[in-house]
């Protein structure tokens, strides 16, 4: 695992298909135990996670992150799974959702749960109070930085809902994260966003949805 902040660790890379990479992220700053965002592809990092204190909670951003690893993570660490309830049909084929997410709120781990449907019906982002006063925004596939350096949204014609996704992006534009971390990407894994530039990044992604829709 690679440490990218004093309280944030990145799992080794996985390549589901050419041009796409994924990671999971272990946040060690939560008051109720370590939090794993997204999901690993293998158990290769389990021992390092255990050495860092294990996984008390796991958060999925949407159904595409569900797979056999969910049950393995829960079995190894006894973790509590937080995930959007509207995607129970897909996630539930692998394991049980322990904390069903439905609306925007700050939970007992200090994480702000922000429903951002559009990429999928249950897509959800998470705003985390990171170390040194910085905030980390975990965006799943809702918005990410492409290999061309252009911010894009996870819009797939026929599968995603353009209008709903646009509304979700407008919502995210009001945030001011210091670090933006998507679950699948073609460029950098975690992107530092200087100052108030985030709203411009979101507008860039929204423009891309308009072109495709």
Regions found by a protein language model. Give the residues of each.
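Short, compositionally biased "basic patch" segments
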Residues: 1-26
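Metallo-beta-lactamase
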Residues: 9, 15-17, 32-36, 43, ...
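Short, solvent-exposed secondary-structure boundary motifs
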Residues: 12-20, 92, 103-105, 115-116
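Active-site-flanking structural segment that lines cofactor/substrate pockets
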Residues: 18-27, 33-34, 40-48
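Residue-level detector of beta-strand structural context in well-folded domains
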Residues: 23-25, 102-104, 124
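Acidic surface patches and DE-rich sequence motifs
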Residues: 29, 107, 130
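Active-site HxH/HxHxD metal-binding segment of metal-dependent hydrolases
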Residues: 41-109, 200-207
């Amino acid at each position: 695992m690679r440490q990218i902040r004093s309280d944030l660790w990145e799992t080794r890379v996985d390549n589901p298909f050419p041009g796409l990479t994924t990671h999971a992220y272990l946040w060690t700053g939560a008051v109720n135990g370590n939090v794993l965002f997204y999901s690993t592809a293998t158990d290769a990092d389990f021992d390092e996670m255990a050495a860092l204190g294990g996984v008390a909670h796991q958060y999925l951003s949407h159904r595409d992150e569900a797979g056999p690893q969910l049950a393995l993570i829960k079995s190894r660490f006894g973790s509590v799974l937080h995930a959007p309830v509207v995607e129970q049909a897909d996630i539930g084929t692998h394991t049980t959702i322990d904390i069903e997410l439905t609306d925007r709120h700050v939970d007992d781990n200090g994480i702000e749960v922000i429903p951002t449907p559009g990429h999928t019906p249950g897509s959800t982002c998470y705003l985390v109070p990171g170390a040194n006063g910085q905030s980390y925004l975990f965006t799943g596939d809702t918005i990410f930085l492409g290999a061309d350096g252009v911010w894009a949204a996870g819009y797939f014609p026929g599968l995603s809902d353009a209008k709903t996704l646009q509304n979700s992006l407008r919502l995210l534009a009001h945030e001011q994260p210091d670090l933006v971390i998507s679950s699948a990407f073609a460029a950098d894994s975690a992107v530092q966003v200087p100052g108030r530039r985030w709203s411009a990044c979101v507008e860039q992604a929204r423009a891309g949805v308009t072109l495709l829709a």
